[in-house]
Amino acid sequence: MTNLINESFTLPCGQILKNRVCKAAMTERIAKGDNLANQGHINLYDMWADGDIGILLTGNVQVDRRNLEGPANVVIDKNNYKNQLGTLKEWSAAGTKNNTQLWMQISHAGRQTPGEINSSPMAPSNIRLNIPGKNYGTPVPMTEEDILDVIEKFVFTAKIARETGFTGVQFHSAHGYLLSEFLSPDINNRNDAWGGDIESRACLLYTSDAADDW
């Protein structure tokens, strides 16, 4: 019997995966206080790329340092990207050896930003996240300007990923972070173009994806 897991697979975009094994995105939290990629990321993905995996997904790389999943996340924004271009290229080189695909997971934590990082995180509405033992602040509903700025941030980070050798990106739209908050009718109670039916709630995700010319 043919083992499909070990067979190559061509994605609709034309990218060829050497097999059908994927390392899921798992937050690394090994950046320092500057939130820059470092040697730890290079070493980790160098090791994983030796594991005969078709796709390696990174942990969430944040687009906005004010809204992080954790204090040791990598952030790529217009203020710091030049300081880590070399490291990002080394990271991608390590993660793409042995014909491995390396996709950067791009994220914005939204209301799920820990309170010690930001007590007033951005979100589609002001519905606070209540989890026993966790400290999350009351979010500030995003303005139209905020939403357009976030779209620009997602696109910028994707652009840097491409330019530094990552072979794809994943927009993190699950696990309670910003994009999934907009998708959820329980969190997104907006009555403008970014809320309401599922098409409108998905507009942030669709617009970010459409603006990214990968």
Residue ranges and their predicted role:
Residues D77, A93-K97, Q101, S107-F166:
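Non-globular sequence segments
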Residues L36, G40, I76-N83, M142-D149, ...:
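Alpha-helix N-cap and loop-to-helix initiation/capping positions
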Residues Y206-W214:
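Single conserved hydrophobic/aromatic residue that forms the stacking wall/gate
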Residues T87, K153, L204-T207:
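Charged catalytic carboxylate motif
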Residues M1-S107, V150:
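N-terminal capping/small domains of soluble enzymes
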Residues L17-V21, I53-D64, M122-R128, G168-F182:
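Short coil-to-beta-strand
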Residues G51, T164, D212:
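Structured loop/turn residues at beta-strand edges in well-structured enzyme cores
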Residues T58-Y81, I106-E116, F171-G195:
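Glycine-rich, proline-tolerant flexible connector loops at the mouths of alpha/beta enzymes
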